[in-house]
Amino acid sequence: MPLRPRRPFDAAEAAAQNDRLLRATITEVHVPRAGRPDLGAHPLCVGCPVYRTGLVGNVVDDVAQSFPMMMAAHLGGEGVTTAVDPTDEEIAALADRAAGCTGIVIGSYNGHLHPQQLGLAKALAAVGKPIAAVALRNPYDLFSLPENVYTLVAYEYTARSTAAVADVLRGHSAAPGRLPIAHPDFANKEAQ
């Protein structure tokens, strides 16, 4: 005899529960001494497009759905989609461009495997603007960033996670998640 649900599936209720679970996983990893940054009215949002990290996936090559473009739409800034491994020239040009913005948001996607992404984050941190870095997959990307960088981990590269991160960056919601790993170098850096 087949099992029958006690009540019909409610797609809206399931979507709301999914959103609550996603928002509960957004994790604040590092808060600079100056606190959560005020990114201002025109932040520069940068990062690479989503790409397939394994042999399975339905990745659509759509720059409009890239983290920087989606984040810029949420925050009212400008979005620039970089290469997965930005060149030194691209990094220098973005650092120059960031000087004219009110703040910076950078999304990393496996930056621990693509060190040029972390080089970009460090170059942008040196500009001196309020800055936030968001790991869109693994939190390892965040451990080597300078002290002045506010860091969050979203664990996924989706429109929903980008909206949740934007709410945290605007101060509309908290980042209650917990980091599931400990990194000795990061712990030592935090103790200093």
PLM region descriptions:
Residues 1-192:
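Preference for extracellular/luminal or secreted protein segments
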